[in-house]
Regions:
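Conserved alpha-helical substructure of the radical SAM core
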Residues: 2-138, 229, 234-235, 354-356
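Short, flexible helix/strand-to-coil boundary loops that buttress conserved ligand/catalytic motifs
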Residues: 49-52, 128, 154-155, 290, ...
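Flexible mid-to-C-terminal extensions adjoining Fe-S/redox cofactors in radical SAM and related proteins
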Residues: 3-29, 266, 285-286, 290-356
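Secreted/processed peptides and extracellular or luminal domains of membrane proteins
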Residues: 47, 51-54, 233, 277, ...
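Radical SAM enzyme [4Fe-4S]-AdoMet core and its adjacent flexible, acidic
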Residues: 2, 36, 58-60, 67, ...
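Residue-level signal for mature regions of secreted extracellular proteins and peptides
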Residues: 34, 38-41, 264, 282, ...
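Short cysteine clusters
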Residues: 41, 45-48, 271, 289, ...
Length: 356
């Protein structure tokens, strides 16, 4: 299998890259769209970025919001017609709590658009699991607690929920199909000492990969690093040992546990990635990324409440330049490293391109 986590995927879409600057006047469809169909989730994770008081992310999120069925079906039609390559369903809430998810992915399964989802795994069962197993490209399940008791404490759920999620993953793999099932472990001070055994337990369930990431506790990079400093060395050692002992051609361990930049300041004044991977929220608003979702003051680029996604997208190139990252994105940004690569590519001197 090729590289799953690489910042260079966008460079396979040269025409899209070259269309990004304002002065081209050209609007092409996004390559990938992240859709947040509902803000409902039955779990209450303490570190959830959309609920944390100390993070700008999700500050205007309303739990009751969801995308109406008719609007979702209209949007899927637009996505197919526009030539969008992929859709990821995520939160906000948990997409598997969206009442029309099954109908939505059934519709997508009859098209060329690839789809995936992020979920807590509690509802990964029944027909919707079969559709994802047979037609989805990947699923990633977020986990923190390492057993029934700890999982219950993390998420405010019953002490049976952890076993249920683990069984759902095991049963999902038994369906067959080509959907790549991964787990995302969000590391904090509570589970840091249990990572090695936890990764072994996850492998034994039969999933394809596990990703290790730090919880984000603040808009300030220094504060994030200060939180992780007491556990940092131990976590790195456990993950290294797990990779040596458990990783093979059937089980990938992707280590994304690292210190964050001390400063989140951005030195560029427009965001290329909002034209590549925009976010559609459950409130029917369009945002540049998941880090700016549900931030109406600084992250809103448009709405499909009274128009279709296609009509909004092609209405004006100016919509994509409303946000100045150097002024309003001085916080954690999932697209920052990708943006810098794209901008470096676009800013290369044309007279000197041959001098590789």
């Amino acid at each position: 299998m090729g590289l799953l986590y690489t910042r260079l995927k966008i460079f396979h879409f040269k025409e899209k890259l070259d269309s990004l600057p304002l002065n081209t006047g050209k609007i092409m469809p996004p390559v990938h769209i992240r859709i947040k169909p509902t803000n409902v989730c039955s779990h209450n994770c303490w570190y959830c970025a959309y609920k944390a008081d100390d993070l700008q992310l999700g500050q205007d999120m309303q739990k009751k919001d969801f995308i109406p069925r008719e609007k979702m079906m209209e949007t899927i039609d637009d996505i197919v017609e526009m030539g969008v390559k992929a859709v990821t369903f995520s939160g906000g809430g948990d997409p598997f709590y969206y009442p029309y998810l099954l109908e939505t992915v059934k519709k997508l399964s009859k098209t060329s658009v690839k789809f995936a989802a992020l979920t807590n795994g509690a509802r990964l069962c029944g027909e919707v699991a079969e559709i994802f197993a047979n037609y989805g490209v990947w699923l990633r399940i977020s986990i923190d607690g390492w057993d029934n008791e700890s999982y219950s404490q993390y998420r405010g759920v019953s002490t049976e929920e952890f076993s249920k999620v683990m069984k759902n993953m095991e049963d999902f793999q038994k369906i067959g199909g080509n959907c790549y099932l991964g787990v995302s472990i969000i590391v904090d001070k509570k589970n840091a000492l249990h990572l090695y055994d936890f990764i072994k337990k996850i492998k034994n369930v039969g999933v394809n990969s596990v990703k290790i990431s730090p919880c984000v506790v603040s808009n300030n990079g220094i504060n994030n690093n200060r939180y992780h400093q007491p556990i940092f060395k131990n976590v790195k050692e456990q993950v290294k040992r797990a990779i040596e002992d458990f990783a093979n051609e059937n089980f990938e361990i992707f280590e994304s546990y690292h210190e964050l930049d001390d400063k989140f300041n951005k030195e560029y004044d427009w965001c290329p990635y909002l034209q590549i991977l925009p976010v559609l929220g459950a409130d029917l608003n369009i945002y540049p990324c998941q880090d700016k979702a549900y931030n109406l003051d600084e992250g809103l680029i448009g709405s499909i409440k009274n128009q279709s996604f296609k009509d909004f997208w092609f209405s004006s190139k100016e919509n994509f330049f409303k946000i100045n990252p150097s002024k309003v994105c001085n916080h954690h940004c999932v697209a920052n490293s990708k943006n810098k690569l794209v901008l470096e590519y676009l800013n290369a001197d044309r007279e000197h391109l041959g001098f590789v």
